[in-house]
Regions:
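Noncatalytic, solvent-exposed loop/strand surfaces
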Residues: 1-351
Length: 351
């Protein structure tokens, strides 16, 4: 079967990066783009649409849905602009939400024993748009934006008029044809979901980052009742998702900095440690056979002992860059490099 989805539109040039997730008889797919953000569920056997949640209160996000079981009830949890949301998998109804997150979420949460853990890093929306578009080569650096400037940043592909109607026209409060200051927040954030720092915050404080734990389950707004802890830290990453096991939340920051937090309190279990492979990281850590595997953008795969203390077991150079997170299945480690897919296993499995 095949289901056609709306063609996603992104002002920034990262493009789509979301993957489908399987849950029982459903295929789940969340696509938070700049035009028609939505969460879809399809029947696995036929492709027939089961439900759809139009996430019009979301900006662009890249977080994937995860299943969280609390007291025998499954919720499909999605992290997005301003909110962590728990969905009823059968109907697509938003069962609960916690207003805890930032503007643009690229990391994916982890659910362990009914608790959802996430690490996030994001700047305020006004500052992002000014810094990225007005200060770009195509911008005029006057501290404000007009439609022509946004179109020049995007390039030759025409921006859908529906995008400008949804954002620019809403934010241009004085109707002077420009977005400036608070108008940027109004344009690119839903009126019921003002997430992240306001345009008045500049410098280092314009970007927030923290680790967070939220108890799953509940109904309605659970912000006050279900947030277990939330701690600011300089050691999160805006792309790499955490690994959680045995009371430890393991983080890797771009540049090769590793921090481990206590899942009960959110406090660091040890000081930040520079990994044996520095440089860029896009892939998230994975665990198998008592080891943690960290794939670096430079092609080195670092192998650590799965323990509270840092112990490096090996470093393997695969010869070309790695962006994708490795996968573990059937006793094998699968790694996608720039031009290859590798299967690494031991014993009979390797044959």
């Amino acid at each position: 079967w095949q289901q056609k989805l709306p063609t996603p539109f992104f002002v920034f040039k990262w493009g789509p990066g979301m993957s489908p997730v399987l849950y029982r008889d459903l295929v789940l797919f969340c696509q938070d783009d700049d035009l028609y953000p939505a969460f879809y569920a399809f029947e696995k056997s036929t492709g027939k649409p089961r439900w759809k949640d139009e996430r019009l209160d979301m900006a662009v996000n890249y977080s994937h849905p995860v299943v969280c079981t609390t007291n025998g009830r499954d919720d499909i949890v999605v992290a997005g602009t301003g909110m962590l949301i728990g969905y009823d998998p059968q109907s697509g109804r938003r069962r609960w939400f916690a207003r805890t997150l930032l503007r643009n979420i690229k990391t994916t949460p982890v659910c362990v024993d009914g608790v959802i853990y996430i690490s996030v890093q994001s700047g305020g929306i006004a500052n992002q748009w000014i810094a990225s578009i007005d200060q770009a080569e195509t911008g005029n650096r006057d501290g404000k934006l007009d439609k022509a400037e946004i179109q020049a940043f995007v390039g030759e592909t025409p921006i859908p008029e529906a995008f400008f109607k949804k954002t620019f026209d809403r934010g241009d409060l004085n109707r002077d044809g420009f977005l400036e200051g608070a108008e940027l927040d109004v344009a690119f954030l839903h009126p019921d979901n003002f997430a992240g720092v306001p345009f008045t915050v500049t410098g280092e404080n314009a970007a927030e980052q923290f680790v967070l734990a939220v108890r799953g389950g509940g109904e309605g707004d659970v912000t006050k009742s279900h947030v277990l802890w939330k701690h600011p830290t300089k050691h999160t990453d805006h792309i790499v998702s955490p690994f959680v096991k045995d009371g430890r939340m393991f983080l890797v920051k771009d540049g090769g900095i590793n921090t481990v937090f206590d899942t009960a309190s959110g406090k660091p279990l040890r000081a930040p440690r520079r990994l044996g492979n520095s440089g860029g990281y896009f892939a998230s850590p994975v665990e198998g056979d008592g080891k943690i595997y960290l794939a670096g953008e430079n092609g080195n795969v670092l192998v650590l002992k799965d323990s509270p203390e840092y112990e490096e077991l090996a470093k393997n150079d695969l010869g070309e860059s790695i962006i994708a997170t490795p996968a573990i299945a059937d006793g094998a480690l699968f790694i996608r490099t720039r031009t290859k897919i590798l299967c690494i296993a031991a014993g009979d499995r390797a044959k």
